[in-house]
Amino acid sequence: MKRPAARWGVGAVTIAFGVLTLVAGGRVLFGDGAAEAGDYVPFVVWFNFIAGFAYVAAGVGLGLGERWGAALALGLAIATLVVFAAFGVHVLSGGPYEARTVAAMTFRAALWCALAAWGYRLIRRDRYA
């Protein structure tokens, strides 16, 4: 890849996002964060916590410019959109939720769609360079 600084910058930010996701989700699931979280939706928190490990791996892959990093980012984008849709069904059926969950899932979906597109663009560009 021709832009290692950009790759590593994106990789580092992605890894940091994964670590923060693990810490935040872990606090809600295993610590004292449940009281602060309010009406959190358990399947969303579990998904985000488990996905946090994949976020770290995707950050490494994207930082290295590996095809599997872009593929993992795409998989995370799709999985996040599926969970977001399930969350929407939960909300529309009258389930309790926090408004910040809507914002967080919107951010996560947009982030992973952008990272997947960025990763594939760089891989494709390097293949034909």
Regions found by a protein language model. Name each.
Residues M1-A129:
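Topology signature of small-to-medium multi-pass alpha-helical membrane proteins
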